[in-house]
């Protein structure tokens, strides 16, 4: 199924990532390196690649083969972060993973929970997936608060799951199924 995308709630919007977004991604990521460093994946075999143009190009390639849905998070019309639905599997697995980052300039404004809820609802209602998983470092209190607010359930720990900040790091696993939010995650979040 080809993805078409433009979702909005209040001041928060999700849209497909565009090639030209690499400049804004680069500006945010490099300006706030210390903010992102504890959570960003690193290369276990060498230096980190800060070629944001190539990263966006690769994300758009994955969009083309429908294995990922790279989205820009906008707040009041400005690019402030990215949310990616990745490892999209249809058929008997019918699952995907969500990862996200947001500029520290707007962190704490409730943008990320709304963005995750919008993306989750789209994947459940439009794409027809059954399960969404979010993996988070246990030390990432802000991200843990996002899944807590949205009602994702804790399922366990993946030991040494992703190479981050020069070491293999454990991640806590959180998931939600479509049956748990029959009226939509955003509606449930706003109601709670």
PLM feature segments, named:
Residues 1-24, 28-35, 70-192:
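Acyl-donor (CoA/ACP) binding surface of acyl/acetyltransferases
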Residues 44-45, 57-72:
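A short helix-loop-beta-strand connector motif used in the catalytic cores of GNAT acetyltransferases and
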């Amino acid at each position: 199924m080809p993805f078409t995308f433009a979702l909005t709630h209040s001041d928060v919007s999700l849209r497909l990532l565009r090639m030209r977004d690499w400049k804004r991604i680069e500006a945010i990521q490099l300006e706030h390196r210390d903010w992102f460093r504890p959570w960003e994946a690193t290369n276990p075999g060498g230096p980190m690649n800060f070629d944001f143009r190539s990263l966006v190009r690769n994300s758009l390639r994955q969009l083309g083969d429908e294995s990922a849905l790279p989205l820009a998070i906008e707040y009041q019309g400005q690019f402030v972060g990215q949310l990616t639905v990745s490892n999209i599997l249809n058929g008997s697995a019918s699952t995907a993973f969500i990862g996200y980052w947001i500029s520290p300039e707007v962190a704490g404004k409730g943008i990320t929970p709304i963005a995750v809820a919008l993306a989750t609802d789209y994947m459940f209602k439009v794409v027809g997936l059954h399960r969404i998983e979010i993996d988070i470092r246990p030390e990432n209190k802000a991200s843990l608060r996002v899944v807590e607010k949205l009602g994702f359930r804790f399922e366990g720990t993946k030991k040494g799951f992703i190479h981050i900040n020069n070491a293999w790091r454990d991640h806590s696993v959180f998931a939600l199924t479509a049956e748990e939010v029959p009226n939509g995650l955003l509606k449930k979040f706003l109601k709670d």
